[in-house]
Amino acid sequence: MKKLITIFSLLAIMLFSISTAFAANEKITMMDEDYNLKNIHTLAIYTPSYKPSALSIERKAKLPNAPELITPDMLTDVIFKVAKEDEVTYTLLSDKDVIQNIKATTGTDISTLSNREALSIYKNNIKNYADAYVIFTFANDSRVVMFADVYDAKDNHWICSYQIIGGDTEDDNLENYSMFMHKFFRILTIQSQK
């Protein structure tokens, strides 16, 4: 009987350690400890920076029924869907809305400019439409990683940075990015309640 209990105990410890080893690792860093996240009533979503993983591109080329390659627009849709599911307390503003507003007020269509020029004009004008903006960056190498950098729209200073690194079993797909977004909005809500 003692051996059986010992075996079950060791098995439970092994299963727990394996699940912990493959779990996603997340971290939030507050760059401005004095900034009150409760001041964010409108959060603008800048076009996510995303490049498909080499494995996803290879699968798409070789397999006829491979999943469709993810695009930044698909990620933006996931962001809004997750925010609605999580019932965030602030208004989200899409990059398309901001681009249209900038075009209407300045006459400049930033979607036709280089990334550097577009971001510069975006930063100069975003204060007219939102309290803060977030730039999502997705990296796909040996692990799937998502970064979310939140900036104050008034003076473009860095408020906080969120990073989540997927486990070894995570894949370059919308389900994982949706899970990452849920965690981001959840931790942003927790930070705003402090």
Regions flagged by a language model, labelled:
Residues 1-7:
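Positively charged n-region of N-terminal signal peptides that target proteins for export
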Residues 3, 48, 95-97, 139:
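Histidine- and/or cysteine-centered catalytic micro-motif in compact active-site loops
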Residues 8-17:
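Bacterial N-terminal signal peptides
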Residues 23-44, 50-55, 87, 120-129, ...:
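C-terminal/domain-edge helix-coil "capping" segments
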Residues 54-118:
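N-terminal segment of the mature soluble domain
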Residues 132-134:
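Well-ordered beta-strand positions
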